[in-house]
Amino acid sequence: MCQVGEDYGEPAPEEPPPAPRPSREQKCVKCKEAQPVVVIRAGDAFCRDCFKAFYVHKFRAMLGKNRLIFPGEKVLLAWSGGPSSSSMVWQVLEGLSQDSAKRLRFVAGVIFVDEGAACGQSLEERSKTLAEVKPILQATGFPWHVVALEEVFSLPPSVLWCSAQELVGSEGAYKAAVDSFLQQQHVLGAGGGPGPTQGEEQPPQPPLDPQNLARPPAPAQTEALSQLFCSVRTLTAKEELLQTLRTHLILHMARAHGYSKVMTGDSCTRLAIKLMTNLALGRGAFLAWDTGFSDERHGDVVVVRPMRDHTLKEVAFYNRLFSVPSVFTPAVDTKAPEKASIHRLMEAFILRLQTQFPSTVSTVYRTSEKLVKGPRDGPAAGDSGPRCLLCMCALDVDAADSATAFGAQTSSRLSQMQSPIPLTETRTPPGPCCSPGVGWAQRCGQGACRREDPQACIEEQLCYSCRVNMKDLPSLDPLPPYILAEAQLRTQRAWGLQEIRDCLIEDSDDEAGQS
């Protein structure tokens, strides 16, 4: 029989042995000769040259296997000043240089969005940040744009329109485009002229201090933006609103200057955190667009994420070893406690798990790679279906589904606001009585304007996640005018289509059978 305390073997260790640290006798795992300087994972020690080759190969492989950027295409690099986006700009800068082995063949530009007003910075602090940003942008040699977030108050409603998307060519079309590009370069080189360095004729370089880009925003717009973010109740809704406005502004700048692609510096770690955050926010239907390599929801401008294979640890090592310049800019969640928002909570959760289980980020990231972009079944399926007013994704909430919580809330709100209507007024169809340019706050208060709830009209044009975030905005007045104008245009367009359907005569089943 077994006895208490009887030993049948050696006792198991209480905790796993620590990972071996690189010593002077250890060599690089790649070249087996040089002394390692960084340890990416347990046992993966690289020397300086091998680590650079490993890092650059990841970036080139991500662009090469997807083949979405054609030669000569204009690409806008969204630079925030952080480590990942700075490393992305540096990779593009080196890839477009003449001494690169496999040179990139697109035309690059850089954009920086000044978000100081949303973060509560003063004009002096914002000017100091811009003074650090402009020398870095000038050093790249790319055409660059510095825009303030306040410019969202001057955007047109067309920024929320999904333009027709050009069909992406097959692999044969991409190879044909490359061959045609190389043939053009050979002809230019044979003519004796200097070859371009970015895939086509070098665009004119911006002046050293372009005054049109350095002008401060209007004080009225700064006050309006501050009022908007101060009116939002939760930090989670503030971060989502900031991301939405930033995306709309970058999208407008890309269209205005002829860019068909936008590169963002989302790293593997950041995308893993974003995946878990979006699941908690109710954006599970859009994970393939929010975390994938390409995001085609905007139609004519495609967002790509070439840094999605690099972890934050690799980015930090590369920037440190090769002196990649970056600028620290405070965000809305800077110095916020861990449980201040869903974004901060998920970030702390993932990073804490990563320290204990080093494969956490890679596991979540590999899961996101398996997500496929598929059309949604139902009335909202297809590219021509209704889209969210803010995130521009296909609506995941059917307006005809009265069993949803939002349908019940909307019906309750409308029943409370609707006043008794005399019989003489029921003979007149309730059509829109205000012009499309009139905002919700300035509507006349008669006819359909009196019976419609502006909050409900906007909520029915939002996806589930954006509806939840809109609950933290007590009033619609602080929203930028282009959002309110587009919401009113969609409402009037839907009313007009419904009126046309009511006037159409449908064939009965008997008449259809006889014909």
Curated annotation (Swiss-Prot):
Q: Which UniProt keywords apply?
A: Acetylation, Cytoplasm, Phosphoprotein, Primary microcephaly, tRNA processing
Which Pfam families is this protein grouped with?
A: CTU2
Q: Name the GO cellular-component terms.
A: cytosol; protein-containing complex
Region (Disordered), start-end ranges: 1-24, 188-217
Q: Which residues carry this modification: N-acetylcysteine?
A: 2
Summary of subunit composition and partner proteins: Component of a complex at least composed of URM1, CTU2/NCS2 and CTU1/ATPBD3.
Q: Identify the disorder associated with this protein.
A: Microcephaly, facial dysmorphism, renal agenesis, and ambiguous genitalia syndrome: An autosomal dominant syndrome characterized by primary microcephaly, ambiguous male genitalia, dysmorphic facies, polydactyly, and unilateral renal agenesis. Variable brain, cardiac, and skeletal anomalies are present, including corpus callosum agenesis or dysgenesis, lissencephaly, atrial and ventricular septal defects, patent ductus arteriosus, hypoplastic right ventricle, and joint contractures.
According to UniProt, the name of this protein is Cytoplasmic tRNA 2-thiolation protein 2
State the species of origin.
Homo sapiens (Human)
